[in-house]
Curated annotation (Swiss-Prot):
Record organism: Clostridium acetobutylicum (strain ATCC 824 / DSM 792 / JCM 1419 / IAM 19013 / LMG 5710 / NBRC 13948 / NRRL B-527 / VKM B-1787 / 2291 / W)
Lineage, broadest ranks: Bacteria, Bacillati, Bacillota, Clostridia, Eubacteriales
Keyword Magnesium: no
Subcellular location: Cytoplasm
UniProt keyword terms in alphabetical order: 4Fe-4S, Cytoplasm, Disulfide bond, Iron, Iron-sulfur, Metal-binding, Methyltransferase, rRNA processing, S-adenosyl-L-methionine, Transferase, tRNA processing
One Pfam family this sequence matches: RlmN_N
SMART domains xref list: Elp3
Predominant localisation class: cytoplasm
Residues binding [4Fe-4S] cluster, per UniProt: C110, C114, C117
Described function: Specifically methylates position 2 of adenine 2503 in 23S rRNA and position 2 of adenine 37 in tRNAs.
Name under which the protein is recorded: Probable dual-specificity RNA methyltransferase RlmN
Additional remarks: Reaction proceeds by a ping-pong mechanism involving intermediate methylation of a conserved cysteine residue.
GO cellular component, one term: cytoplasm
Catalytic activities: adenosine(2503) in 23S rRNA + 2 reduced [2Fe-2S]-[ferredoxin] + 2 S-adenosyl-L-methionine = 2-methyladenosine(2503) in 23S rRNA + 5'-deoxyadenosine + L-methionine + 2 oxidized [2Fe-2S]-[ferredoxin] + S-adenosyl-L-homocysteine; adenosine(37) in tRNA + 2 reduced [2Fe-2S]-[ferredoxin] + 2 S-adenosyl-L-methionine = 2-methyladenosine(37) in tRNA + 5'-deoxyadenosine + L-methionine + 2 oxidized [2Fe-2S]-[ferredoxin] + S-adenosyl-L-homocysteine
Length: 345
């Protein structure tokens, strides 16, 4: 049996036609889904025979809520979701003045091996389908009772390691027949799989591309990100310049600041020289504490100096505001803790 959420409207129309149903029933079905109705039986404007046929051939792959944590400030909600096969992922809703943003997962676990990230501990279990990625937004919207208007593909998993499902998901949520979320309200974060960035460029999307750089030289990057053994920083920067020229979009470079690893003035100068003249922005992220590592965030004064050094190279940077620290809102932390508790560790 298939997850009907893996179908877009055009595909479901084809299925309806092939199975003797009126094609407009596909739109009716998705109207119910996008308005928070996740049971065939409750879709009252679909004939009973249609509902029964759908139920016989499909299931609505909506995850169940394992855990919901609300931050004390009320600006962050973190969910642990369980899919039909028992696999667990997490997503985070962040509430801003301009609307609600959601950070979603694209894989169960991750195989990229970045040493500062909890998501990669235990490796990659499997890819999420386009429908399973979509379901995170639909379920979160229903849980909080508010619309989500911004999407960040920055949860567990490497989006470009699950390329086809992620691209299909983006096109579904961007479609007027889907959630109608503008492409410029969607950010895709990657550790830098160069061939896939070129593929993404050819999709001609207007999403924001965010590169998890986290170092300004290959030697340092190799210590914290295994992907650096495959693609050098110079290859990534060259690729990003071409991507930006082709799409006209500014690139975001993410840089996790780790005390005594990549937070010194020399690292900031190298980063400034590397990105000078590019249409880009740097997002500085004081590293989150992960029990399995000894990494610590630098002092505030050192973070500010790093920022000031980049400014000398005319590179705009922001220091990411910490949200949901009291609920383990950083990528992979809650899932990891839950798995360890379940295993009695």
């Amino acid at each position: 049996m298939e997850n009907i959420l893996d179908y877009n409207e055009a595909e479901l129309k084809q299925w309806m036609d092939k199975n003797g149903e009126k094609t407009f029933r596909a739109k009716q079905f998705f109207d119910w889904i996008y308005n928070g109705t996740f049971d065939f039986k409750d879709m009252k404007n679909l004939p009973q025979s249609t509902r029964e046929r759908l139920e016989k051939n499909f299931y609505i792959g909506m995850p169940s809520v394992v855990k919901r944590l609300n931050s004390k400030k009320g600006d962050t909600v973190k969910f642990l979701f369980r899919y039909n096969d028992g696999n667990i992922i997490e997503c985070v809703v962040m509430k801003y003045d301009y609307g609600n943003s959601i950070c979603i997962s694209t894989q169960v676990g991750c195989r990229m091996g970045c040493s500062f990230c909890a998501s990669t501990i235990g490796g990659r279990v499997r890819d999420l389908t386009s429908g399973e990625i979509l379901a995170q937004i639909l379920k979160a919207q229903k849980e909080i009772g508010e619309r989500i208007s911004n999407i960040v593909l920055m949860g567990s998993g490497e989006p470009l390691d699950n390329y086809d499902n992620v691209i299909k998901f983006i096109r579904i949520v961007n479609s007027e027949k889907g959630l109608n979320i503008g492409q410029r309200h969607i950010t895709l974060s990657t550790c830098g799989i160069v061939p896939r960035i070129y593929d993404l460029m050819k999709e001609n999307l207007q999403i924001t591309l965010a590169i998890s750089l986290h170092a300004s030289d290959d030697e340092t990057r190799k210590k914290i990100m295994p992907i650096a053994n495959r693609y050098s920083i110079s290859e990534i920067i060259d690729c990003c310049k071409k991507y930006s020229d082709f799409t006209g979009r500014r690139i975001t470079f993410e840089y996790s600041l780790v005390k005594d690893v990549n937070d010194d003035k020399e690292s900031a100068k190298k980063l400034g020289e590397l990105l000078s003249g590019m249409l880009c922005h740097v997002n500085l992220i004081p590293v989150n504490t992960v029990n399995e590592t000894s990494y610590e965030k630098p002092e505030s004064s050192k973070i500010k100096k790093f920022c000031d050094t980049l400014l000398k190279y005319k590179i705009e940077s922001t220091i990411r505001k910490e949200m949901g620290a009291d609920i383990n809102a950083a990528c992979g932390q809650l899932r990891r803790n839950y798995i360890e508790e379940s295993e009695g560790k």
